[in-house]
A protein has these predicted regions:
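Conserved N-terminal phosphate-binding loop of PLP-dependent enzymes in the Aspartate aminotransferase
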Residues: 1-347
Length: 347
């Protein structure tokens, strides 16, 4: 399918067919496609240059001021994870990573090593760094290995199918980290910025929170947020930044992010209410990060876009715009109900 137009929670293909989009581009379009405030912010951004890395634009500095903790910016979610993992090595001097089955942290080699999907890792095993100690998601990892500089976990797993850990699990990880001095990294790239009804999931326990996807309002932007503020100093290694990219802090993305930070807090109650509607229909997860058994292609034929998900690919995932209306949600769920009922009968 080729999208030729997108507005809010609806997209149109090259044949002019309209779809209800429950993917929001893997959660990126949290305020809806072509959100008017985001579009206006991009169009009117006081951009003196298009680069991000050479020097901060004023709008980039404003974003840094608006974030609740010191931040090292990236372009992709994977960048934020790489920053967080390298922070642990710099701060603790230990290369070991404790990660979890079903985790998805990115496909760069360091983030990939921590990712829990074997089919992503297998072609590149010879190059993957480590050691990585893999544990069962949602369970007590036990005493951490001596070489572990950090634990990295998602507050709700996205690609694995909206897996929600038991209440208190992140606090349990915090206790395990405190036993050895390891850092706790919360990868909230998918679940953060309102997706599960919280702005900064894990903020009470994390040393570093990774955010991305929704942050740039549709443009590429991510950040590793140093909740433990002194960790920022781990990167004071000399006159030149040793981990950067050409477009870090791109002013257009930063202008869009300022709108996201304005608007998402107003939507948290709405997210929880809409999430309850999904739960009534048998969708697991939290907020507007949801999954259930189903067929993404069948859903597409019914005019609804969802994402294949799950450890074995047998689930469909819904991550709609946080702005989805009751009418759009009812329409999408009605179509999906017929689709999943038919899929269940044929399975």
């Amino acid at each position: 399918m080729i999208w030729t137009r997108a507005e809010g929670c609806r997209v149109w293909d090259e044949n002019g067919r309209e779809y209800l989009d429950l993917s929001a581009g893997f959660g990126v379009a949290a305020l809806g496609h072509r959100n008017p405030r985001v579009m206006e912010a991009i169009a009117s951004a006081p951009v003196a240059h298009a680069l991000g890395d050479l020097a901060d634009a004023h709008v980039t500095q404003e974003l840094r001021r608006r974030l609740p903790w010191p931040a090292k910016l990236g372009v992709t979610g994977e960048d934020a994870v790489e920053i967080a993992l390298r922070t642990a090595l710099l701060a603790k001097g230990k290369p070991g990573i404790v990660a979890f089955d079903g985790a998805y942290h990115g496909t760069g080699l360091l983030a990939l090593a921590a990712t829990g999907f074997e089919h992503f890792r297998a072609p590149f095993t010879a190059w993957l760094p480590g050691p990585v100690h893999r544990r069962a998601y949602g369970e007590d990892p036990g005493p951490l290995p001596d070489d572990a500089g950090c634990v990295i976990a998602e507050p709700v797993q996205g690609r694995a199918g909206a897996r929600v850990p038991p209440v208190g699990w992140l606090e349990q990880l915090r206790e395990r980290c405190d036993e050895t001095g390891a850092l706790l990294i919360v990868d909230a790239i998918y679940a953060g910025l309102g997706r599960i009804g919280e702005l900064w999931p894990g903020e009470d326990v994390a040393d570093v929170i990774c955010v991305g996807k929704a942050l740039g309002g549709g443009l590429p932007l991510s950040a590793a947020l140093f909740v433990r503020r002194e960790l920022e100093r781990a990167w004071h290694l000399g006159p030149e930044d040793v981990l950067t990219h050409t477009h870090v802090g791109n002013p257009l993305a930063c202008a869009a992010a300022l709108v996201v930070l304005d608007e998402v807090p107003k939507l948290l109650r709405r997210v929880r209410a809409a999430g309850a509607r999904f739960a009534e229909e048998g969708w697991q997860g939290a907020g507007l990060l949801r999954a259930r058994a189903g067929d993404a292609q069948a859903a597409e034929r019914s005019g609804v876009i969802v994402i294949p998900a799950g450890l074995d690919g047998s689930l469909i995932s819904a991550t709609p715009a946080l702005t989805i209306s009751d009418e759009e949600l009812d329409e999408a769920l009605s179509r999906l109900r017929r689709t999943t009922d038919a899929w269940s009968r044929s399975s």
